[in-house]
């Protein structure tokens, strides 16, 4: 398959205008009943609307990179799901810094953000816009609706599969909301369509809801690797459960490491395989070269899904200084994103000659950072590119073709190993070691980087997660799970806004509910200490 499925988001955007264009935050319902009634009468529209749900991770509005945005009150490119998620997951950590002084962007490094932060508000709005979109599709594909809309018997099973996928996408989005914000507004397809004030759900209760949803839809999803590229299958359900269980102690106070082993094992043995090249997973044709490893990816195309967010942001923003933008398949660098020396130190050889995951640009760059606003301070990261695996340019030098892996098999290898080391049962350290060394053999090209059982410990796993998964939206969650995101046990350059790094209060492990949401909904209470 090509990216044909996700291209349908262009068509879906036009149809979804009546369904969803009025949603700018949670209290505005994205439903126009008359439009819904007409669109859902024709089953030929259903797949295009489903594509719009998947496209919620990629596109930002109805007409392209700018104009008619889904989210108001912020630059449209900045409102991108992936861009917002990356900034909230990576900028407060050792993996990424950014040189721009746009609004409150530097507050992520300083870790002194407030409930009035525009970037946090935009991500909150994006999450609940996506949830509202999913809710409407789920409502319209219930059995009674399918019957009243006259959907033919031959199409019912397909409609139910589409519905299960929409429920998965809603669960994934709620997972991100739970991880970032903790206690959030809670709306499902069973809630009334008319205006009302949603109740707030606790983090632990939301965890239980997502878990129930995933287990309920598991058998309704396509088998692992049986769906089109860009669409979710059973392995995605298992992977999200494994991720939740690995972090369950943070979310609920109760560890679930045995369950993390169970579900990561399901993914690992499901038929997905590690891609042959690490570097190719982040290039313009990764949808072709790396689909054996990508459980689910946000699809991007330089012609059909243009946005200033997503991987367009990740490629352009990481190019600056003496770097040649053309070598990354783009027409310009935005001179923003780099990394800290603390992250660089995870690699014993930063040249990439041994561990090929060490993808740094050092020419003209200082290893240490004195001024965040100076691009040449801090090594640049060359992981993301709009060049293909064969060296050709992507289809557009402004908007990139590179897909963003929301879930990939390597994470499950790391999840299994960590859960075993944390005391989960049903796995073995021998198998865990094999899974870790499989990643390292790909990275090194041979067995020279393999570790022994004596070297396999929790500290190593955190470092290996950094080496394997950096700039893919995992680091904040990982550091929180290890108790290192706040406090003084681990500091990195500009943690807490200090060049040498400093301790940060524990309440920063979740973000505040935006002030605008609190004002709009009297049922919401602010997270503690905000």
Where are the language model's segments positioned?
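Long, intrinsically disordered, low-complexity segments
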Residues: 22-23, 40-43, 77-99, 114-117, ...
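Bacterial Sec-dependent N-terminal signal peptides
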Residues: 2-5, 16-44, 171, 210, ...
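Conserved, well-structured interaction surfaces
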Residues: 47, 55-61, 92-181, 197, ...
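Short coil/turn connectors between adjacent alpha-helices in alpha-solenoid helical repeat scaffolds
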Residues: 123-127, 200-205, 249-259, 426-427
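Flexible, polar/acidic helix-loop-strand segments at domain edges
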Residues: 100-111, 341-409
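An aromatic- and glycine-enriched ligand-binding surface/loop that stacks and positions planar moieties
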Residues: 23-100, 104, 184, 207, ...
